[in-house]
């Protein structure tokens, strides 16, 4: 498992917003939930997606390496939720799930459950007072 970070990072450590620590902690958290991710090479690229249809998307190259593009101006909550959603797509690709409707349905299902679980965990680095209800 290798996690790379690239792009135009908008780091604000004071409110734990999308810093590399959060990204790596979230990836470790997801690997605990879905061990198949441990075998993946993933790059998280923060980029301006203002003119795109969503907050993030996932690609896989010919070498089997995954590239997750994620909007660089999201709130902490949206960043965590979006990265979880895209990492679920990585898991699905590794498992061979190709049906787009099933992929999106499962990703939306997990993003809600796992974002709450991650934010309540010590891995998030989020102070208890800032954990969304």
Language-model features: where?
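Active-site recognition of the HExxH zinc-binding catalytic motif
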Residues: 81-94
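Hydrophobic (often cysteine-bearing) scaffold residues that line and stabilize catalytic clefts
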Residues: 22, 80, 84, 103-106
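Short, intrinsically disordered N-terminal pre-domain segments
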Residues: 1-4, 133
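Hydrophobic recognition helices of helix-based DNA-binding modules
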Residues: 90-91, 114, 118
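Acidic-and-aromatic substrate-binding clefts and catalytic sites of carbohydrate-active enzymes
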Residues: 77, 98-99
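Short, function-defining helix-loop hinge/capping sites that tune catalysis or transport
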Residues: 93-97, 112
